Amino acid sequence: ANQWLPVDQYIGGVEHAVLHLLYARFFTRALKTCGYLDVAEPFDGLFTQGMVGHETYKNTEGAWLSPDQVTINDGGAAVHNDDGTTVTVGRSEKMSKSKKNTVDPANIIDTYGADAARLFMLSDSPPERDMEWTDSGIEGAWRYLNRLWRMVDETPTDAGPLSPLNEMDEAAADIVKATHKAIAQVTEALEGFRYNAAVAYIREFSNAVGELDAGLKGAGPARRFAVETLARLANPLMPHITEEMWAALGGDGLLADQLWPSHDPALLVEDTVTLAVQVNGKMRGTIDVAADADK
């Protein structure tokens, strides 16, 4: 036990804080007091994740209904699938078998894939907060995965090496800089368990890459570098599609076996800064000026 303790990170729901976590800490301290252990605390870090919730449904007799028994009609009303009777929609609560507000993950995976489910759950809210499961959310995640795959189809596999930034079109050079910025942002977010922020940075980055004009000087290598990096950054969150992206781009071996990308701090320095414009103490707008501009 002295070799393996303390555990680096404990992850558990709020119910663990008054059961397993309490017992684990108590027995560890007791064993330390008795001289059997060298550590008093069994865990270095604690992270408590939120719960997944869903709307609750009742039929006309007050019995609970599961989500797959309910349909929203054209008028926006919830009705029973079997007889079309009105269904009462209750507030979103933690998924439980007693209230039948659970969603079968097998059906979701069969329809949208595991990556879409992972992406939706990670992007919907900070992991320490509760989240509500919605069909629109999982569909949005699925559409984004399809967009990522289309980006691979539009990326040249024989683009050649990156040129120096001063030999590229400005827009292509900006994508290279955006790639290094995304590496820094996503890395920091993942290390801090801010998975929703990591997804937001990945989406922002992919939007920028998608807008790059393929005809610009240096755009081909810049896009390939960006899309390869995008796959690497998204791999912990969406492992299945990013492995396919990596293979389609000609990557060697499994993406999961590759080293995590590192950023160049020099490329994170902004060429311009945004200044607020005030008139008589009231903000009237903003202007972008060169970072080295004279006062």
Where on the chain are the PLM-derived regions?
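Glycine-rich, small/acidic residue-mixed loop/short-helix segments
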Residues: 289-295
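Generic "edge-of-domain/loop-turn" microfeature
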Residues: 53, 282-284, 294
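Hydrophobic/anchoring residues in structured secondary elements
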Residues: 48, 288-289
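Helix-rich, typically C-terminal accessory recognition domains appended to large enzymatic cores
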Residues: 22, 26, 36-42, 107-288
